[in-house]
Amino acid sequence: MHSTNQSSRLFQYPCKSTSTQYPIFIFPKFSSRKFVKSLRTSIDYKQEGASKEDLVVPSNVARRLPIIIKKSGKVSRYFIKGDSLELLCVDEEEDDSTSFCLGLDDGFWKLIRLTSSAAKDFFLPKQVSDNYISYVKWKFLHRVFSSALQVLATQAMFRAIGIGQSRSLASSAAFNWILKDGLGRLSRCIYTASLASAFDTNLKRVRFSTSVLFSLSIGVELMTPVFPQYFLLLASIANIAKQISLSCYLATGSAVHRSFAVADNLGEVSAKAQIQTVCFDNLGLLLAVLLNMLFQHNQRLQACLPFVLYPIFSTFDLLGIYQGLKHINLQTLTKDRLEIILERWIEFRQVPSPAEVSEEEGIGLLGSRGSKRVWPIRIGCLDPKAQIPTLSMMAMQSLCSDDGYFITMELSSQGFRRIPKSGIVICLREGANSVDVITSLLQTCYIRKSLGANRTKRSYLSFSDLTLQDWTLLTRESKRAARDDNIALNKQMQEQGWIVKNVLLSAEEQIRYIFDKNQL
């Protein structure tokens, strides 16, 4: 255990203890203070005799902040107007001093640019190797002609089994069947595009929810004999659900297999998984055949058999999936897993193993564990609709070019009843790496621990209870503690088997800000 600043009253580590005394910063109760103008998250800050009112922008004046957000092909900038924060699109802004203003007056070319950007985000992942584009081009050629051949084969099969002698009837049957498959594939495409990053960050939750969807699709297919006039509609709905479930299974399969491969034998683990799937599926097929043979002399019982067995078999199916997911110990880092690791580190100075984190993380069907806590932590850009305290807006004004991230607070409405809840936001800069993500989250966990400790000591702790001096000291000392912990924390995480090279973030968490040096 170490402490670089023995005189610090913010963070103190016990030498020998299994349950630590949380680092607490007790906010002074006197009101006569000198406020700071520079509210940076870095260690070197300057205090000046400026009051909070001197730095608040008048309501009739909008001050540009040096923070630019690029999202979905649009460029936006934060502005402070009065005591509120606004995020305005600056694509049309005629300002040659910054390279972010595109200056395209032609609406047609702007539409082309936005369309191409949307198509790129829809089809391509954000971080891939250089040869990925060439691979996708050849994959396009392969899949287009393969799909066309399947259509021709389907039409030929309908003719072979005697569905009508006329061309129109065979074509109609083939068209209806292809329509069913086409809707399923289209839904699968839309689903995977909308949840691309969720397959990494919420793998267990997405996989179990799609398994429930697959089970429901079986129930829909069982209803087709009851409503034969709606066969195409029911079959299409069931196929859509199956395609969505299949897309999730394929997208998450490699990550699941990688978690079990301890000797870089991913190919062997995947091959054995396919063998297991084929053998287990054949056993299920044999069970269904035996049950049908048992009731083959009673047509009424045989017709009712699927409806009787469906809830029983579905329960066992989902139970097996749920219990199996609990035994998957993912070594990749996400924001939620990092929170669990860093909280354990702050309290016990130990990094938990992937198995321990997996047990605490669970499946997460009711949402992430961190979002239900006091002062939940969020990574992303600031929401202008949320209430941002004045001291946080002043921190954004004084942001410097050396900062790889900044930390602010917000008051947002959550849940069905839209109850306001205080939270902490981490805004990462463009080019931030995994070290920046881990350091910023560790610093924020230190801040939350201090705020939570003060909340228990007082009946209520709000934004107004924090002065600029409080927040500056809190961010300064927490960042110092996070930086001091970096080497020891990273070493223990690697020893426990965590992959620290990258931190997997959701689409909203991947949004970065760009620091505009011309605004200084």
From Swiss-Prot:
Gene Ontology CC: one annotated term: membrane
Annotated coiled-coil positions are: none
Keyword terms: Membrane, Transmembrane, Transmembrane helix
UniProt family annotation: Belongs to the RUS1 family.
Pfam annotation, one family: UVB_sens_prot
- The reply to whether Hydrolase figures as a keyword in the UniProt entry is no
Localization (cell):
Membrane
Annotated GO biological processes are: anther development
Q: What is this protein called?
A: Protein root UVB sensitive 4
Q: What is its main location?
A: membrane
Xref: PANTHER family: PROTEIN ROOT UVB SENSITIVE 4, RUS1 FAMILY PROTEIN C16ORF58
TM helices/strands, residue ranges: 275-295, 301-321
Look up and give the membrane topology term. Multi-pass membrane protein
